[in-house]
Amino acid sequence: MKKAKLIFKDNTPFSLDFDDFYFNSKDGLNESKFVYTHSFEWKNQENFIIAESGFGIGLNFFLTLKRFLQTTPSKRPKKLFYISVEAFYIEKEQLREIYQKLGFYEEFKELLEQFLKFYPKAKEGIYRFYFEDCFLDLVFEDIAVLKELDFKADIWYLDGFSPNKNSQMFDGNLIFEVARLSKKNTQICTFSSASFLQKNLKKYGFRVEKTKGFRKREMIKAYLENELEFKDKEAYFSRTFSSLKNKKVAIIGAGISSAVLAYELSLRGFKIDVFEKHLELGKGASGNESGILSSLILKPKVNLGEFSELSFIEASRFYRQILDLKFKGVVEFAHNDLMQERFDTQRENVLFKISKNQAFLEEGGVIFPKNLVKNLFEKSKACIYFNHEFQAYKFENECFTLKFKNDIVKSDYAVLIYAMGADTKDFVFYDEMKLSKVRGQVTHLKPFLNTPFPLSSKAYICPVKDDLQVIGASYDRLDTSLESKEEDDKQNIENIAEFIDKNTKLEIIGSKVGFRSYSSDRFMIVGNAYDEVFYKEEYKALLWTKNKEQKLAKMSCNLYFNFAHGSRGFSTSVLAARYLCALINNEPLCLEKKYIHAIHPARFLIRKLKKGL
């Protein structure tokens, strides 16, 4: 990612990349208020979305958030979503220094320090920050990334240096995407009154009004007169906006994917009931004593690898923001030539500090799954029903009625979510969706190696906790036994041989078996259940029509999937939960389209139809 080149000129940040000031050198604070943050009225609605081209030093955001928090709750939206795109990265310490030099630091100190505490490294991606009743999605990408995003803004801040210095931020391609991501009466706020900007706004349906700008300057405001009719060549992956009869949600399964989802839903005011077939938490794969938060290391530009990296860093940031966890890092070792080749291609990646055959992932570390899942459920205030083995559902009058073993019935749920991990295989019956159930066994040893962070190679070693050290894990697609096996313990020990002296005597004090859920392409399966009959009929000619506009997809009901997280569910569950909340609650989707397509439940069927099969 490009780093911003800036200096101070006239006591104001000045961009060497664009030969322009970040904002008015005379009175930038009041100009930002006049042009952007105080130029519209709040609406008393569920979600209010502000989108911005050019985050800069974040001044517009902090002014907006401060105004939002100072407004009486009954006179503002329930939730503020703020999406800002920035192509030029400013270092954390430099941002703090800028606010101090400008004399803004004390005014924004509390919000700024909360932001800087979880500020990511200089790497492209969408990074979420949690504030009171507000989500900030900071998008570190070129502005062209807008074509990958999906939301309908109430307000747009078109910022980003003078148009004659940065024309890309105001050209026709950008304004088309701005219009696509807007709804009727969306307001455009901008300091510019450039004629070509006005022309582009009018071209895509905005009513443009000239108005007095800050001090003697002239500026414009624009309003979208009618929402664009936008047809998509990949409409089979598009969202369908949901309508809910109530805010009751049922989640089947009580593992990590369910726990993160329950917490995220609770932030939006949903009442969550969780149904678990076991008698307590921690009986499945999410119940190990210790585990590792880490990332796959694949070659650059590999979709699965990039998604794993984003999932990893966002999970790390989530656990630090929400649970105040502290991570000391994790060391990954290249244990064969293929792994070493991957390491060699990732030496410039800021997530991986690679030296020879080792990669240190600073944001990773040891996790304690049982405690983590328990804490998230407690924060969510979800009601967990143990000893409830799900059997079937009935959907009528826009609500679900659930049937459990022993003739137990629960009803009146607007949303049903499958998050039962490996057991999902018994409840999803799409022909093209191939799921596998993989057995894994971890071994509990008496402490034998003093390490502050996990070590991962053929197998992994966790730091000592409660006089116990966890190693693992085995991998078996064919074995379905719940019983621990001596040969698996032996294999786990053999796989950590590189970390211990051959004369070291290891004492096994226990084992635990769990089952992982995998898809055939290793991506998780997350999204709305789809209408298979509709898909097979409507998209049957995709072999010949895949480059033409498609009819919008049809979903079956408010049934959602959240499974096939494999062995990295503690990473992927965070993005899964945010994405599902966005679908259920009609929020901005927090993922780029390339990732949405990769995790969509219908992807296997679409691939088949594109081949004419």
UniProtKB/Swiss-Prot annotation:
Swiss-Prot/TrEMBL cofactor(s): FAD
Region (FAD-dependent cmnm(5)s(2)U34 oxidoreductase) location: 252-613
- Give an example GO molecular function: tRNA (5-methylaminomethyl-2-thiouridylate)(34)-methyltransferase activity
Highest taxon, organism lineage: Bacteria
Q: What's an example GO cellular component term for this entry?
A: cytoplasm
EC numbers, comma separated: 2.1.1.61, 1.5.-.-
Cellular compartment(s): Cytoplasm
Q: Where is this region: tRNA (mnm(5)s(2)U34)-methyltransferase?
A: 1-225
Name the keywords, alphabetized: Cytoplasm, FAD, Flavoprotein, Methyltransferase, Multifunctional enzyme, Oxidoreductase, S-adenosyl-L-methionine, Transferase, tRNA processing
Q: Which SUPFAM superfamilies match?
A: FAD/NAD(P)-binding domain (SSF51905)
Q: Which reaction does it catalyse?
A: 5-aminomethyl-2-thiouridine(34) in tRNA + S-adenosyl-L-methionine = 5-methylaminomethyl-2-thiouridine(34) in tRNA + S-adenosyl-L-homocysteine + H(+)
One Gene Ontology BP term is: methylation
Where is it mostly found? cytoplasm
NCBIfam families for the chain: MnmC_Cterm, PRK01747.1-2, tRNA_MNMC2
The family this protein is said to belong to: In the N-terminal section; belongs to the methyltransferase superfamily. tRNA (mnm(5)s(2)U34)-methyltransferase family.
What does the record give as the function of this protein? Catalyzes the last two steps in the biosynthesis of 5-methylaminomethyl-2-thiouridine (mnm(5)s(2)U) at the wobble position (U34) in tRNA. Catalyzes the FAD-dependent demodification of cmnm(5)s(2)U34 to nm(5)s(2)U34, followed by the transfer of a methyl group from S-adenosyl-L-methionine to nm(5)s(2)U34, to form mnm(5)s(2)U34.
Protein name per its UniProtKB record:
tRNA 5-methylaminomethyl-2-thiouridine biosynthesis bifunctional protein MnmC
Protein source organism: Campylobacter jejuni subsp. jejuni serotype O:23/36 (strain 81-176)
The coding gene here is mnmC
